Design a protein with these regions (language model features):
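Structural signal for beta-propeller blades
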Residues: 27-29, 70-72, 115-116, 126
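Beta-propeller blade signature
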Residues: 122-135
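Ser/Thr-rich, Proline-interspersed low-complexity disordered segments
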Residues: 138-151
Length: 151
């Protein structure tokens, strides 16, 4: 086990058979079989997800909050391999940590890690951004504007 942040962000596959989690300090993605605990590293080819934190899974598409941005990963039907796709950010993001899908939007939680030595600014915020490139192949630039609050 390496020092630093390790397992983070956990989601279940739609059938409940597997859990996916990211190792924050290495960028590795893992698949855990719920029935027997067998764990494999998901083959992302040359891709990785350093700083991975929050995860959201919609079918075979995994959204990963990492290093101030959101990255799309397209996974194989057995969740054993995948392709790291495009990443995006938004001016409304402030140290984003996790996310959830709501309709055609991603709701991204903004942390206040930068306020650890003082009082947090209230209220805490959640950014609402359109899902970029919905229905497009990974790597295709999005025609959807990423204006905060437009969802």
């Amino acid at each position: 086990m390496q020092s630093g942040f390790n397992a983070n962000g956990i989601v279940a596959t739609p059938d409940g058979r597997y859990l996916l989690l990211v190792q924050t300090n290495t960028g590795a993605l893992y698949r855990v079989d719920v029935a027997n605990g067998e764990t494999i590293q998901v083959d992302l080819g040359a891709g990785s997800l350093p700083g991975g934190d929050g995860l959201e899974l919609e079918g075979q598409t995994l959204w990963v909050v990492r290093e101030g941005q959101v990255t799309r990963v397209e996974l194989s039907p057995d969740y054993a391999s995948g392709t790291v796709g495009d990443s995006f950010t938004d001016p409304s993001f402030t140290d984003p940590t996790t996310l959830a899908r709501f309709d055609d939007c991603l709701l991204v939680v903004n942390s206040q890690f930068s306020q650890q030595q003082g009082q947090p600014e209230l209220p805490f915020t959640v950014s609402s951004v359109p899902i970029p490139g919905a229905g497009e192949a990974v790597g295709t630039p999005s025609a959807t504007p990423l204006a905060a609050g437009s969802c």
